């Protein structure tokens, strides 16, 4: 049985996007020193949403100086006073959540259901969570009176713009640091709206500074001599470059990089439940997730049954307008990312894997890619080794738990994994054997601000979230 869904669009009118935005430095919006701007577009239709200032080295220096000046008073505030600001920010995010969700879907391309029901609740939850820690740092296990580091330079990606901002800013402020944050070039708007929330909350000037720009802006921020802490989420290639820049300095560094997660399904797993977990694991946020379950490892005895059910489920996925509440898969974030996804999918075919995608009518304008499944994949295929960062699933098989572990660990990355089985002892054994920072049991892509997140190998180092996330912003 198939169902037809009438469009159920969220109103774009709930968010007011200005024609242009400056940099947020020392509590005020200002033009870039060089006067340069760039356009941010909607990936769903390539419409220009706004013009945004391009920060130069001079702007980076101004922002870092503002953060350094604010640090003296901010770090001296009692934790309970800092907590009041964080609680206020969290409540303002909740009050403006509909506006922010629409903005995120417009600028990023993700479905409104995801930005509304997943991203925004987690954003607020992170500020609430770390507000609770601000006056309890002496009980976090890092000494009786842990001290902040100073100025934190933070660079975030385009896949979860506002959520990654919360992951970084909330613990930094709770610990008494000040922040200079650079959002991704293709998704700057939610960070600029957050700057306005900081003003609404009465946050002291200079405590949070937002610099928009391209990779050169991020490089200037990372290299600035008065930055004490660098936190980066993004590609492994850029992460390695940042590590080289920071090497030999006294900067503290956290890197959360790429992944090639294995979603492992054993023969005793409930098929329908596993299929939902597989779909959520790879097609959530168009596969633009560092911990996406982009490799499906299925036990040979249930391969046919599982793939048949998975294809049926994929055929029901709706691709289209991110603001339509019925949409399951939105737009790819940029033309560059779409080109990379296409190139790796083509490589999968040319290397001998069998490609399948459901019948899917894609919009003419914008950047789109149908949910895609590859079978007959081997460990040597590029689609089994390289991060695609799109809605592409590579299927491999295994016979024994030992073989599943060997295949799952045979990747440069070590960020996440999922295990589907009814045997608790098997789950515990697998979790101990898998070289992954996060292992989900009979679920996937579940996040909580109280739970640490991070990986091994080329997936980076350090942890964000939970009590462990405080350590990155304390002098311990």
What are the language-model segments listed below?
Residues 136-273, 398:
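Rossmann-like NAD(P) dinucleotide-binding subdomain of oxidoreductase/dehydrogenase enzymes
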Residues 46, 78, 82, 104, ...:
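Residue-level signal for inorganic ion chemistry
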Residues 71, 75, 90-97, 101, ...:
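Structural signal for hydrophobic packing residues in well-ordered secondary-structure cores
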Residues 47-51, 203, 227, 264, ...:
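Conserved C-terminal structural/oligomerization subdomain of aldehyde/semialdehyde dehydrogenase
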Residues 47-137:
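Glycine-rich loop-to-alpha-helix module at the N-terminal edge of alpha/beta enzyme cores
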Residues 237-378, 441:
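ALDH superfamily catalytic-core signature
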Residues 1-51, 84, 88, 125, ...:
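Terminal low-complexity tails and localization/encapsulation signals of metabolic enzymes
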Residues 48-55, 70-76, 154, 263-266, ...:
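Short, well-ordered beta-strand elements within core beta-sheets of diverse protein domains
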